[in-house]
Structures are given as structure tokens and as C-alpha cells.
Curated annotation (Swiss-Prot):
This is Cysteine synthase B. Two cysteine synthase enzymes are found. Both catalyze the same reaction. Cysteine synthase B can also use thiosulfate in place of sulfide to give cysteine thiosulfonate as a product. Pathway: Amino-acid biosynthesis; L-cysteine biosynthesis; L-cysteine from L-serine: step 2/2. GO terms for molecular function: cysteine synthase activity. The modification N6-(pyridoxal phosphate)lysine is found at residue 41. NCBIfam families: cysKM, cysM, PRK11761.1. Keywords: Amino-acid biosynthesis, Cysteine biosynthesis, Pyridoxal phosphate, Transferase. GO terms for biological process: cysteine biosynthetic process; cysteine biosynthetic process from serine. Transmembrane segments: none annotated. One of its GO terms (cellular component) is cytoplasm. Its EC number is 2.5.1.47.
Amino acid sequence: MNTLEQTIGNTPLVKLQRLGPDNGSEIWVKLEGNNPAGSVKDRAALSMIVEAEKRGEIKPGDVLIEATSGNTGIALAMIAALKGYRMKLLMPDNMSQERRAAMRAYGAELILVTKEQGMEGARDLALAMSERGEGKLLDQFNNPDNPYAHYTTTGPEIWRQTSGRITHFVSSMGTTGTITGVSRFLREQEKPVTIVGLQPEEGSSIPGIRRWPAEYMPGIFNASLVDEVLDIHQNDAENTMRELAVREGIFCGVSSGGAVAGALRVARATPGAIVVAIICDRGDRYLSTGVFGEEHFSQGAGI
């Protein structure tokens, strides 16, 4: 490997040792935090920029625009720095300090909208900026180069790493790029694989997973590629995230906890299943939020 972009992908797939049910099923997780900018979004970020370059839509020195809740923005900021683009990122102001700091460290310009405006507001502002000629909108929510990254890399890797044994694929749904691309690839293989998507329960807030209003449903989403959608409560996602750290040694974020909570639900209901879930990022991106309970230790509680 000679360049940073060549280190994106080919992430490890590991079997959970202690959290899975004792019914002959197996839960395997793909450690996307091993990508250079720390998340599964490295794949889509690289794909959206490289494919746009191939079509002659952008060139180094151009301004790129994107709305993000964090991971895509960090990944795009990394690729923009690597390739010589100027990156403008729109993000709600209730996202973690680590995300803001990482984007700025890569040299991106960060524009915050209010938490009340949310991702919908960030998307609207990104579109308006693009229409005013302030830069090229990459539009991860409607850009087919997003799922294409997972069709050409993530899906084939999972199939190869499980030697085709996979029976269920479980993925949190945000932009839906991961589940759409992986499912499309798995649908083309010689055996059926059940595709399970995850969204937050009504009233739950899980960073990186969305329950989109109909008018904001990502254009890349193809409902025919998803067999089942599970609702995940915020508490289940957070508790599973913490369990992964202390029982499996896997330090990940809340949406990854949600994915594994869903995988556990599938495995318990399906003896003998080979379930694969995506660990989409690392836990260090969430420390300032207190979700791991570290604020109690800083106050001396429990010591």
C-alpha cells in the first residue's frame, strides 16, 4: 500500500465471544473504525469524490459541500485534505465536540445549524449553498456513489470473510448507503441472505441512525433490498455499546451498539444463524457526551 486511500476498506470481521446467545447462532461484526478516518463513511467519502472526478464534475481546488451528522464529514474532510479540495460541512450543533474538532483538524470549514433544525435543516442549507454557486454538493443522501462503495467493497468483503456462510446482515440506517449497497451485492449471490435494517424507536435519538420523515427519505434507499426493519430504543443501543466495550473489548459508538442490539435480537430468534453487523465507528468520538458514564468517574462517583 502506497497511499492513504488504499488503506480504506478490507476491515476485520470478528466473532463476538461473550454476548451471543447459546443456540448455535454466531454474531460477527465488521470493525469499520479501523478505516483511517475512523468509520465506515470513509468508503462512501472516497467513492463520491473519486467517481465525481472520473466524470469530470470536480477537480482539486474546488469547494465541496456536504451535510453531515459527523462521520461522513470527518471522512470527507480527510479525503479533501488528501486530494486538495476545500470542504464545507453543515452539521447540527448538538453533535459531539470530538466530531467538530476532527473536521476542523483536517482543515474543513464547519457551519453549524441548531439542533432544532437538525439534519433536515443542514441538508436544506447545503442545497441552498450549492444553488447559490458556493460549491459542489456531494449529497450523500441521494448520490448513488454512496451505496456503490458498499456494493463494490463492503459486500464482497463480508461474503469472502464469512466464506458465504452469512444468513443475516444487520445494519443501522442513516443515509442507507451501507445497507443498500451491501444488500444489492448479497442479493446477487447464490444463497438467500436476510437483510435487516435498524431505525430508532419513535422518540429515541441515536447518532448516525435516523427515522426520516417521508419528504427527507434518502433517494438512494431501495425498500425492496431490505427484508425487515427493527425499531431500536436509545437505551438498548447505549447499553449494548457499553457491553461491547466491557465484555468484548470493542470500543464503538451508539449506532454500532444499536446494530449489535438488533443482531442479538435476530440471533436469539434464529438458532444456527450466521449474523453479520456493522460496527461503523469508534467510541472515542462520543466520550464528551457522557454516554459511557465517564462523567461519573470525573466527579469521583464509584471510586
